[in-house]
Each structure stands twice: as C-alpha cells, then as structure tokens.
C-alpha cells in the first residue's frame, strides 16, 4: 500500500529560502579554462614551478610536501614549458630573473628567428566564425620587434591575425581577433622575423561574449547553467583547496584580488596550477550579478587533515585571521577605507551587499580545529556580528558556541535513500545544519539516474526538516572532461560544449518547486531490506589478530582479545574497497566503549553505541551477520543486535504553494516497477495534476555530449481517479495539484 495523507492547512515548518545553493571549488580544472573564460593554458608561464618546501620526483612525476603528502606533478619546468611549443627556428626558455612583477615567478624569453611559439589552450582553443577574442600580453624587447598574433588551426590555417610592435620595457600590448572559421582545436600562435630577444611576462586570450560581457569574466554557457538552478547562495572557494597540503598551497584571499597579472599563482592539491583569475572579487561580482548570497570559506591555520596535515603556529594563525578580516573588509568597507579603496580601484566603488555567510575552515575537526575555531569565531563574531558563521565539525558537542555545522556526505544511493530521516531527531534548539557537500558516488561515477534517485530521496527528508537544515549544496560542481580528478560532477564541459548529469535536473526540479511551507503529511510505503555482503577484517592496536577466525561464508567471526588494554576493530560486510568506494561496518571496542560505525564512501554513520565493563583482560568477541542483521557478543553476553534501515519504495515531502493554492508533492520511486500512490488531502483537491518526471529505462542511464538531455524532466497533465496517481519506476516526480 502506498499512500500520502496530507493536511494542507496545518503548517509543519516554514521553508528555508536558502535551502538550495551551489558550491564552487577549483577541481577538475573548473576555474581557468572552465567557468573562468581564459582560453590559454599556463598563461603566466609558472605552472611548472615546484611549490615551496616540496621535493620533485622526476621518475614518478610527483611532489612531496614537508609533511609527506605525495601529489601528482606532470608539468615540471625541467621537462618543457607546459602548454607552449616552439617551431620554425624559434627558441624559448623560462627565466626567474626578469619577471613582470613580484607575483610572477617566471617569464618567457624568446628568439623568434622567423619561427613561432604556440599555445594549445585547454585541449584546443574553441573559436567560432564572426566571434571576437581579446588577446593581450605584457612584453618587452630591447629592439623593435613586430609580432604576429594569430588564431589558427593546428595545421597552420589562419583564422584571425593582428600585428603588434613590441619595443622597450614591459608594457601591455593587446588586440582583437575575429575568427573567420569554426574550430574547436584551434591554437594561438605568436610569430616574428625578429632575431632579437623578446620577453613575455604574462598573456591572456578571452572571448568577448562572456557572462554579463565582463572583460575578466565567466564563460557564459556555464554561468547560465548555474543561474538556471535558481541558487540561493554560492559557497567559495572550496573545499580542500582552502586548506592546501602545505603552508604555501593554503588559500589566501589577498592573492586573489587586483589586476590578474599581479596575483600570485596557487598550486592546487588537485594537481594543477591556477593564476587566481577567478578570485574573490569575481566571486562577489557573480553573486551580485546573479542576485544570490555569498558564502566565503577561509583557512583557519591548518592544512588538509586528510593529506599529512600541518598545523600553523600562532604567528601564522594570526596571519590567516587577518587575511579573513581583510576579505570581509574588502567586500563591505566604504571606499574611503584601506580595503574599500582596494575594491574601488578594482572597479566596484560601492560595497558588495551579498556577503552573508562565513565558514571557518573546511572539513577540519578535532582538538586542533576546536582551538582555532574558537579563536576565529570569538574574534570575528565580536567584530562582525551580522554574519552567519559555519563550523566544519560539531563543535557544539565540545561546548563551543556554534551557529551552523557543515555536514558532508559522499556515499552510495542506498545510503542516501535509507537516511532520509537522518535529521528527524534534531530538536528545535539544536545547532542548525548546512549540508555543504553531498553526492551519490559509489557506482555513479559518470552521474546517472540511480544517483539522482538516492539523493532526491535524501532531500525529501531534508525538506521535511527545514526548521533545522537550512542550506544544501551538491559537490563538486564542474568537470572539464579532459582533466578529471573527481567524479561525479554536476556539470561536465569541454572547451566548447557542456551537459548536465541527472542530479542537476533533479535539483532544478526541487529548486523550482519550493512551495510556501511544509504542511503536515505522512507517507505510507513498503520497504526493501538492505542486504550487505563482504568479508571480515580485524585488527588489534592496528595489527592483525592472529587468533581471530571467520567461517567460510564470512558470516561469523570469533577472537580472544585483550580488549581492556587496547583497541579492537572488526570490519564486517567489508568490500575491501578503499577511499570513496569503501563500504564496511566497523565494530570498535576501546576503553569500555563499543560502537558500530558504517563507513560508506566518504561518509560515516553511527549504527549503535554502548558500553561493556569486563572483569579481567581477555574476552571472547563474537560477531554474527545475516543479510541485514548483526549480533555482537562479548563473553557470551549480547552487546549489540541491530537490523539495518530498510529502503523505502517511495519517499515524499509535501508543501503548499500559497501563491497558486496548490499542493506541491515531491515523490521518488526508487524501485524497478510502477507504483500507484493514493493522495488523501484534508482539503478537497481538483482531479487534475501536473506531474514533472525525471526517469529513464535504466538506473545507469545518464547524459553525454552526444545526448545531453537523454535523462531530463518531462511534464504532463494527468487525471486523478479517487486521488490515485501513477508514479513510474525509477523516477523523481514533482506533482502539483490545485486545492479547491
């Protein structure tokens, strides 16, 4: 039986206007060559510079930080000039002796000798006939050198060409290039007959058709896809890049404002360099242009704790604190103040009004974070009380003042579907929640319908709890298809096209159909058990237990362990996968505490907690599993017995749209069969409904460059018979029914 009972005139909670937002992090080359419309790769020539305090291994093409974190590094300057090639007798080399300014680490010295140098762009430069592109460079030459700037095919066919005359010390030289042809694999070439030395300190190529026609702007099609989601806010700039994996790679606001050629570069822990062209100013400008709120995330004095962390000393913590303060003042101070004047100099005289949220760190936790969080929160709240401050851990559990906590979940779709009641038990006086990063990842790397179904089921629970869960944002946002570091991502692009995964369309449906308030309702549904499988893995104080044993079907475990004097960890139903694909349940026994935790993807869920007071040291530990049940005994006494949460066939949430006098019902069917749902309302409904449905023939169905809308919403008007509506298999649905 499937039924939704609704009381439209009984308000359960108000909607949170900020519930659906977006989160940008420069991952998968989402910045330069992506949302930031720059078309030249390595435009500042410093991509191959090894970050300070890191060592380079040429054999493995990796760098290692001072604390031991190893990261890919495939563009070392000792092995070529990344993105640039020379031909026809031209010779080029990098130098650190004659750079454009103190922010630039390298310049490019060239003797053309009748030849050319070429930039390949981001897997090619995409040009269109009749479209214009603005090129500029800072260059110098002791003698007059005439340089041809061309857009051309990789085979030498010229589409646009202009001549620049370079002479004397560094100066900015620019020109407009109008292409005569279409080509997604074009290149930019600089050529000259000169044999004299020419030095280039910075270069850039931008389309003139950017979002809002801004000169240092955003790629229009990608920005418009973001706005189509109707976001309430934008979280920026990360993500793990805020922390970095070393002191030098930690994010600093002051490196991201001013003329782009005067901004320090930033080696990102995702394995590439950014020139910070898409910086703090551009972030605020986009929020203002889009009419949305801004959330700024800043480093609180520590690097990424998942990457051999480094905890900054008090002096550097204070430096990071001042960096955060300066960012706030840059956005909001009058133009006649120090930081307001810097903003005005960059073209925005009036303060930005969009800054609303400040997040202290990213994915930080533990004692080191608590100490830094308190320092930042206490001082900032005193000086800037008007903002909402967000913690990255549940600092309220340690007695710290906490306004909002940023929860992150990367798991499989079933984890999301079974946890749609995760926030039901939160009290009205508990801390507010921001689900700042979430995505179904396991089995969904390319982005498919299955992921959207699980996420949608989870979000119905979030919508029911908007008095406690105030904001959400999917992550990551963008993926350049040629530079993938993380999947799935909401929007996939190359240098000329883009498409959105099914989760994008699900979120668009949800954001466009908010209603005015959540009304009282209850959902009646059948369930499927969550059957787990996998092997046992067990350790004591970090080392394997020799005496432990499991049966041949991996359904039971037994071991004699000195659990009073150590830490016992038994993983069961373990698939043995690591990282984001992991799925296992850990029984952890230490200091009399016995806890079962489910690790799924990058998420963890406490299944049960308890205590065990033992007489003597050694104990017999036994674990039995059976499909969706487990029992744990110590010395024959039952410590835990639990059944996993079942998977609801349908998940739903109901709001009332007061402007249209309609019920807005979001219904997710995660099964492989059609389901008839009866809708019963305390207030009479009309017998017609508008139903918008996201579905496909397969759970694995997704979109691509060739079929960008293979999985996209379709709207239909349907007739209700006795309040019954058909909800198709594998579908996300928004049903709107007028009240009489």
Predicted feature residues:
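Secretory/extracellular carbohydrate-interaction modules
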Residues: 529-595
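C-terminal beta-sandwich/jelly-roll accessory domains of carbohydrate-active enzymes
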Residues: 533-534, 538, 552, 577-580, ...
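Catalytic-core region of carbohydrate-active enzymes that cleave or remodel glycosidic bonds
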Residues: 377-389, 397, 403-404, 408-513, ...
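Extended acidic/polar, glycine-enriched regions
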Residues: 115-228
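Aromatic- and acidic-residue-enriched carbohydrate-binding clefts of CAZyme catalytic domains
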Residues: 22, 53-56, 60-107, 242-280, ...
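Short carbohydrate-recognition loop motifs
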Residues: 95-114, 531-544, 593-598
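Extracellular beta-strand ligand-recognition surfaces/modules
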Residues: 4, 137, 173-204, 341, ...
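An acidic-aromatic substrate-binding cleft motif
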Residues: 5-40, 46, 180-182, 191-273, ...
